[in-house]
Design a protein with these regions (language model features):
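N-terminal small-domain helix-loop-helix segment of the aminotransferase-like
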Residues: 1-68
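Structural scaffold positions in well-ordered secondary structure
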Residues: 4, 137, 171-173, 198, ...
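PLP-dependent aminotransferase class I/II
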Residues: 12-14, 102, 194-272, 278
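Short acidic capping loops at alpha-helix termini that bridge into adjacent secondary structure
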Residues: 55-59, 83-84, 165, 172, ...
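Glycine/small-residue-rich loop that forms an oxyanion/phosphate-binding "nest" at active or ligand-binding sites
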Residues: 65-74, 170-174, 178-179, 188
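PLP-dependent aminotransferase-like
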Residues: 75-139
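Short, conserved loop/helix-junction motifs that constitute active-site signature segments
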Residues: 78-80, 159-163, 188-192
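Active-site phosphate-binding strand-loop segment of PLP-dependent enzymes
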Residues: 116-179
């Protein structure tokens, strides 16, 4: 049975991932990693720093994208009196749930339906953020479930025109499905201190059961990094598999192409049925 409620992976992992699992030495789990003594978080954050050209100290690592989200919301909403997060009108239900966990509240900005898709109105996002002045602004790109996304230029325009004390969290869990470009990430997080961009191995890399998420944050957040970091290190098995996944882009890009073919077939066939409207 294929479950469709959490966008899980119904294809095979890459050969490199399978090999990393088979070759993993279980005795490794008898010891903590010592990389924290070198001033690093993980062998994974070191590799991510090389891939994304972001300083290792500005890279976050956690138990899936979920932990990236929870850590950010819990930390920033619990500091000070402003406990409001601004989220998309149609979005993952979990966003407002996490805000409620730490006594926060949420308000929503609208998304707009076009002929066969939804879209952000960047000017309205800016206007809402300046008027409400939330502690956090959440942008999902692409947004789940509507699928609309923001360009790097649009993210930059939002960052340039909102209060600098509003922390912006960009959820890019599905970003690799719509673009191979990641060159915009480093310039954005190096320019804007109030920005977090979060990604995961759960969607494009098809490893939701591994529970590995990562993110990038602007400079000047040593206390938040200390809040997130694991002094005794991360799961060493997960680290080994994560490294293999990050070296398997060709495999997962081929899988994504198959998914897109299936999606277009689904769109065509379902769109031919009376009473159904299919969105891009």
């Amino acid at each position: 049975m294929n479950f469709l409620d959490r966008n899980e992976f119904n294809f095979q992992p890459s050969e490199k991932v399978v090999k990393a699992i088979k070759d993993f030495d279980p005795e490794t789990l008898c010891f903590y990693t010592r990389i924290y003594d070198e001033g690093k978080k993980s062998i994974v954050t070191v590799r991510l720093s090389e891939i994304y050209n972001v300083p290792e100290e500005q890279i976050l690592l956690g138990y899936g994208g979920e932990e990236m989200l929870k850590n950010a919301i819990h930390y920033f909403l619990m500091k000070g009196e402003n406990k409001t997060i601004l989220i998309p009108e149609f979005s993952w239900w979990y966003y407002n749930r996490v805000a409620g966990e730490c006594g926060g509240s949420f308000q929503m900005y609208p998304l707009y339906e076009t002929e066969d898709t939804f879209a952000y109105n960047v000017d309205e996002v800016i206007e809402y953020t300046n008027r409400i002045h939330p502690r956090m602004l959440l942008l999902a790109s692409p947004n789940n479930p509507t699928g609309n996304s923001l360009t790097s230029e649009e993210i930059g325009r939002i960052m340039e025109n909102i209060p600098s004390d509003t922390m912006v969290f960009v959820d890019e869990a599905y970003a690799s499905f719509i673009t191979t470009d990641t060159d915009y990430i480093a310039p954005l997080v190096m320019k804007y201190n109030n920005l977090i961009i979060a990604r995961t191995l759960s969607k494009f890399y098809g490893l939701p059961g591994l529970r590995v998420g990562f993110g990038f944050i602007g400079a000047g957040h040593d206390m938040f990094l200390s809040y997130c970091n694991k002094y005794l290190g991360y799961n060493r098995f997960s680290e080994a598999v994560a490294l293999a996944a990050l070296e398997s882009d060709e495999h997962y890009r081929n899988v994504a192409d198959k998914m897109e073919w299936d999606r277009q077939l689904f769109k065509k066939e379902l769109g031919n049925l009376p009473g159904f409207k299919v969105y891009k």
